[in-house]
Amino acid sequence: MLLPGNAGAQSANAPSSIYTPKTQPQPQPLRVEVIDGTRFRDIETRTVYRLYGIEACAPDQTARLGRQPWPCGAMAVAWLVTATLNRWLACGSVRAEGDEQLVRCATAGHADLAADMLHDGVAVLAPLAPDDLKIPSYAAAQADARKAYRGLWSSTFEMPWDWRTRRDRQSALDNEVRR
């Protein structure tokens, strides 16, 4: 039945007795290979995607639970591999950034990969630029993980962006010394 007020949503070539909504074409589902804790590559197109709004430890970064170091970067990679291995991903693009697509993605087991990573404490909220979309459920997921001392929040760790900056600075200094 065609309801009044829905005529604007009617497809141009559909008979007037049949309602057909105008919809955006859905992106094709992806099969991916994980690059690091927030990035993966489509195995067919080789396009690189990065989860929007979060950061995870670098693959070689560690955290410390008491006196015990643990590989928080490897854990983030393992979490993302487990969530995506042999599963189709449905991703919506937020924007392109360099040669990567910033995306929000879901699988059959995860309504929002980034939110679930935050909830499990394997990722943290990324610093957002002023014009970036803030996602309240992401902040709530991180607050929940932090309150429950899940994952990173049970440990001492350096924020991933600070760790990468320090590592890059140290690497540059090491290269200068070698010259």
Predicted regions and their residues:
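Small beta-barrel nucleic-acid-binding modules, primarily SNase/OB-fold domains
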Residues: 3-179
